[in-house]
Amino acid sequence: VDAELLADGKKVFAGNCAACHLGGNNSVLADKTLKKDAIEKYLEGGLTLEAIKYQVNNGKGAMPAWADRLDEDDIEAVSNYVYDQAVNSKW
């Protein structure tokens, strides 16, 4: 994955996602973090970039949909950032 894309994703995450998901955690539902094992267990579609993008776009439960708040480039960037953090156990 492109380093610039991940850097952009980190910025989008800090400005939009960190309020609930700081450090890959979940301040609303403690078990449903952004860590690898939790994503594999709870995210419909598992730990895939497409499943993360779908969740960001459409939301689910307490998580709002971001498709009307972020543009496609920001969603692509933040999804890649979350995926990279989870797959490589960086949270």
From Swiss-Prot:
> Which UniProt keyword terms apply here?
Chloroplast, Electron transport, Heme, Iron, Metal-binding, Photosynthesis, Plastid, Thylakoid, Transport
GO terms for MF: electron transfer activity; heme binding; iron ion binding
- Where on the tree of life does the source sit, at the highest rank? Eukaryota
Q: Where in the cell is it found?
A: Plastid, Chloroplast thylakoid lumen
Task: Offer a single GO CC term for the protein.
Answer: chloroplast thylakoid lumen
Q: Where does heme c bind?
A: C17, C20, H21, M63
User: Which InterPro entries does this UniProt record tie to the protein?
Assistant: Cyt_c-like_dom (IPR009056), Cyt_c-like_dom_sf (IPR036909), Cyt_C6 (IPR023655), Cyt_C_IC (IPR008168)
Q: Name one GO biological process term.
A: photosynthesis
Has the keyword Iron-sulfur been applied to this entry? no
Q: What is the recorded post-translational modification?
A: Binds 1 heme c group covalently per subunit.
Biological role stated in the UniProt entry: Functions as an electron carrier between membrane-bound cytochrome b6-f and photosystem I in oxygenic photosynthesis.
Would you identify the family this protein belongs to, as annotated? Belongs to the cytochrome c family. PetJ subfamily.
Q: Describe, as the record does, how this protein assembles with itself and its partners.
A: Monomer.
Its protein name is Cytochrome c6
- What gene is this protein translated from? petJ
